[in-house]
Amino acid sequence: MTNISSMELGCDVVTEKPITTDERKAQRIIDAQKKTGRHIRVAFNYRYAPHHTKIRELIRDGVIGDVFSVHFEWLLNTVHGADYYRRWHRNKANSGGLLVHKATHHFDLVNFWLGTEPDTVFAFGDLNFYGKQNAEKRGVKDFYYRCHGSEAAKGDHFAIDMDNNPTLKAMYLDAEKDSGYIRDRSVFGDDISIEDTMAVLVRYKNNVMMSYSLNSYLPWEGFNVMINGSKGRIEYHAVERPYINAGGDKKNEGATKTYEIKVYPMIGEPYIVPIKKIEGGHGGGDPVMLEDLFHPGAQEDEFHRAADHVDGIKSILTGVAANKSIASGMPIKVGTLVNF
């Protein structure tokens, strides 16, 4: 693992999310960090987006009182969402599935907003839309292995044409002779082992409850978050721009088209919360995070957005526990997965 070998060579580490994909590898990172004393930063850019930071501020300032429950719904559309089923992510042994690879962002946000960590997780998950069997149920008859060179792919809305995208062609198609990696698999193949429909229940250590859903075949991309407390409710709605990963337009990755945070006081009129807009990927979070990563401590951060390996591992453990719950049909105690 690159994180571990870097620390063993005496380096501090900056890593993308997810920090890893299962509890065994997470424990190895914990042990290596203790042994080497090196520092790990996890690049959780969503923490730095102004609208996400605003939620932490509202909760911190007691605007809705003590938080009791959260409902978090994430929607992936058939551009970005479908892309996970073309690539290496379609194999759960590689990616941990979307509950680890994608939802680590969302689970980290909840940990960050509430200042807590998961205690117990229960989940359901199925592959209902993607995959050959599901396509056959809908009457699809023309199947193909990959888009490149396939006549059947030309009429498929879900096919990705790397020949006509210079960035994808150079990065993947032209490199196949060296890498052996095929980037444009059919999303209706018969060897997909990740889910596309997921529902998760989480009890946190501070007794807050969360219901979470993730679906990856929907007409629009974005999320709805509802946070309920002793003095009111926050409703947070966002629509994001769809994109193809590594498709050449970096600024659109996670870029927000529209968003609104609305507070509903228990007594009084609801109101929309003003948010300062910052240009950049992931809702304006990328430039703020990069400044913090490469100039740490230049400015004091009242929201403590910098994430270390402990934050990174706690974010994946919700998804790891959810995967175990889907497989076993039982609730999972998160504290049994690793030792910090």
Regions found by a protein language model. Give the residues of each.
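A structural signal for well-ordered alpha-helical segments within the folded catalytic domains
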Residues: 1-4, 27, 49, 53, ...
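A short glycine-threonine-serine/GTX helix/turn-capping micro-motif
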Residues: 94-101, 187-188, 276-284
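C-terminal helical cap and adjacent loop that interface with cofactors, partners, or active-site loops
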Residues: 194-340
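Glycine-/small-residue-rich active-site loops that bind phosphorylated ligands and cofactors
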Residues: 20-21, 47, 77, 219, ...
